[in-house]
Swiss-Prot record:
Gene3D superfamilies associated with the record: SIR2/SIRT2 'Small Domain (3.30.1600.10), TPP-binding domain (3.40.50.1220)
Pfam family of the protein (one): SIR2
Positions of NAD(+) binding: 20-39, 98-101, 186-188, 212-214, 230
Active site (record annotation): H116 (proton acceptor)
CDD domains per the UniProt record, alphabetical: SIRT5_Af1_CobB
Key word Metal-binding present: yes
Superkingdom classification of source: Bacteria
Main location: cytoplasm
Organism: Leptospira interrogans serogroup Icterohaemorrhagiae serovar Lai (strain 56601)
Name the UniProt record assigns to this protein: NAD-dependent protein deacylase
Length: 246
């Protein structure tokens, strides 16, 4: 690690990071995939779709409130805080996260985009108005309604089969085209978007460093693979980067 950073220290003008479910898992948040995603015998793939919401919005909201309750008990870990420190000290850093739990913002990250949205945002299906008003099954009839137009509210996340937000996607693509060092953190590559963005960065000349407990589908494409948990490896990596400023 140290030799790699020393050799390439002139490539640290623009640093970016892509974070995935692995960094959230280290805070105790389930991935909500596979067996971890089962809720009342439903899979995430059965509930996180526009079709599921159209068919049974109350059921979908019950699942999302269950997820919100779990996430609210969790806190950012050293991996989140290491990225905050990198943002604080490095003049040109940007974070793209697949995670919808809001832990990066809770830790203090400001230069970021939540490309899959945020689970705590409520968005109207008609007028698009967004809020973070707390919704509880005990006090709010499900599905909740928009105070502006009375249409149903939905969670402010990207569902299976939906397009990404144009602004967030274009912002991420442009950042990948103009980044020197990309940190790929806790993402398995099972979702195509991080692979797509990382490939843009690589094709544009960026160096790629991946931190993961196991090799992923694009580990063969990175310049340095560091095996381990993000919360354990990333703080050390960032100390090396900040100790060797360009």
């Amino acid at each position: 690690m140290k030799e790699f950073i020393t050799k390439h220290r002139d490539k640290f003008q623009k640093i970016s990071a892509i974070s995935g479910a692995g960094i959230s898992a280290e805070s105790g948040i389930p991935t909500f995939r596979g067996s971890e995603g089962l809720w009342k015998n439903f899979r995430a793939e059965d509930l996180a779709t526009p079709q599921a919401f159209s068919k049974n919005p109350k059921l979908v909201w019950e699942w999302y409130l269950w997820r919100r309750n779990i996430i609210e008990t969790k806190r950012p870990n050293p991996g989140h805080f290491a990225l905050v420190e990198l943002e604080r000290i490095h003049p040109d850093f940007f974070l793209i996260t697949q995670n919808v739990d809001g832990l990066h913002s809770q830790a203090g990250s400001k230069k970021l985009t939540e490309i899959h949205g945020n689970i705590f945002i409520n968005r109207c299906i008609s007028c698009g108005q967004e809020s973070k008003e707390t919704i509880s099954e005990n006090t709010t009839p499900l599905p909740p309604q928009c105070q502006n137009c009375n249409s149903f509210l939905r969670p402010g996340v990207v569902w299976f089969g939906e397009s990404y937000d144009d602004f967030k996607l274009n912002l991420s693509i442009q950042r990948m085209k103009h980044t020197d060092l990309l940190l790929v953190l806790g993402t398995s590559g099972s979702v195509s978007m991080p692979v797509y963005l990382a490939q843009i960065a690589k094709d544009s000349g960026a160096l790629l460093i991946e931190i993961n407990p196991e090799r992923s589908s694009f580990s063969s494409s990175v310049d340095l693979f560091l095996q381990g948990k993000t919360g354990e490896v990333l703080p050390e990596l960032i100390r090396e980067i900040l100790d060797n400023p360009s």
